[in-house]
Design a protein with these regions (language model features):
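"A position-specific structural signal for the A-helix of alpha-solenoid helical repeats
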Residues: 48, 82, 89, 130, ...
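Residue at a conserved register position within TPR or TPR-like alpha-solenoid repeats
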Residues: 52-53, 87, 135, 183, ...
């Protein structure tokens, strides 16, 4: 009975014991009642309606709620952000970007009022995280990178190092690590190579792993295989420093990095010319990504199907590449609805 347990995304049905259908009926009754009486909508109802439907097979059913919600609480960053949940799922990335920009502006006002040493810092990072994600799917490097940099600016060691709040600390460090996704997504190989490693790998443990992941791919793309292999080994060594109990959003951190492991291996073998081995790794990365629990946005921000499809296409495997892209776009219903990336520029 929490937002992430209202649907089983594999069966497309509510799990046993969930009051999903009843909750949807109640929300839609309240929304309809306000409409009949020409009254302003209740933002809490619209907020819940979005959460109820984002994991369903028809998130567009909450599109009207998303459109109505944004302006109802202009100084509430989370409410400004919430429409983006639906917009991203429906491929309305420019609208998701606009919602995220509004939320980020409001959150800066709250930061100036309350400072960074509070739980709301995680919410501010969440809104920036969605901004990164939607701009990546739009193919817009500069705003995606700006959001990533703002996350890092918001999370110096004294904000992350909350020994009495390990879950919050772990969540915030996970946000910090996301910067590398943007650089890999846009092929910024030299910027990745030039990025310094974290000074405190004990505190920035996910970030350390993500740096080694990105540097492996960067060196592989530049055909510097000795350095790529060194970074690969450093990546595996860094994983041993992450507790099996460490979670990032709704998934174990090591499970999320397992997606990256197979992407890393796939890219490395591809650039070495071992295409069959590379494609096997990338297909496994796709499967691992599909097996993650839903989180908004997804914790692995670079859909493996995009890498697999592009490299298949480059080697002339046109039919499989088409199927991979069609799955990503939601055109063949092989991927659960909330795992599809409608209208994204990388698969179109």
């Amino acid at each position: 009975r929490t937002p992430w347990h209202m649907w089983d995304v594999k069966t497309c049905l509510p799990p046993k014991g969930a009051d999903t259908y009843e909750a949807i009926r109640l929300c839609e009754y309240a929304i309809g009642l306000a409409g009949q009486h020409d009254e302003e909508q209740n933002p809490a109802i619209l907020h819940l309606h979005i959460h109820l439907l984002e994991m369903s097979t028809e998130p567009e059913r909450a599109m009207d709620s998303a459109d109505r919600l944004g302006g109802l609480c202009p100084d509430a960053g989370h409410i400004q952000h919430m429409p983006g949940h639906i917009y991203v799922l429906c491929g309305e990335y420019e609208k998701a970007k606009t919602a995220s920009e509004a939320a980020i502006l409001v959150n800066r006002k709250y930061l100036s009022y309350a400072g960074p040493y509070n739980y709301y810092t995680t919410a501010r990072c969440h809104d920036l995280h969605l901004m990164m994600y939607t701009c990546m799917l739009l193919g817009q490097f500069e705003p995606a990178m700006a959001a990533a940099e703002e996350i890092c600016e918001n999370l110096p060691p004294d904000v992350i190092d909350l020994k009495d709040k390990p879950f919050i600390a772990g969540t915030m460090e996970g946000y910090f690590a996301m910067r590398m996704h943007v650089l890999v997504r846009f092929g910024k190989w030299q910027e990745i190579i030039d990025s310094p490693m974290p000074e405190r790998p004990d505190l920035y443990c996910l970030t350390t792993s993500m740096h080694h992941y990105a540097k492996t791919i960067a060196f592989a793309a530049l055909k510097q295989f000795d350095k790529a292999d060194q970074e690969k080994e450093a990546f595996y060594a860094s994983l041993r420093c992450i507790s099996p109990n460490r979670k990032l959003f709704n998934n174990p951190a090591l499970q999320i990095l397992g997606v990256g492991e197979k992407m890393l291996l796939g890219e490395l073998e591809y650039h070495k010319g071992n295409y069959d081995i590379a494609f096997a790794h990338l297909r496994e990365s796709v499967q691992r990504c599909d097996d993650l629990h839903y989180s908004e946005p997804w914790p692995w921000m670079h859909p493996p199907r995009h890498a697999l499809g592009a490299l298949l296409l480059e080697q002339g495997h046109y039919e499989e590449a088409e199927e991979v892209y069609r799955a990503d776009l939601g055109l063949n219903d092989t991927v659960p609805r909330c795992g599809q990336h409608k209208n994204n520029v990388w698969a179109l």
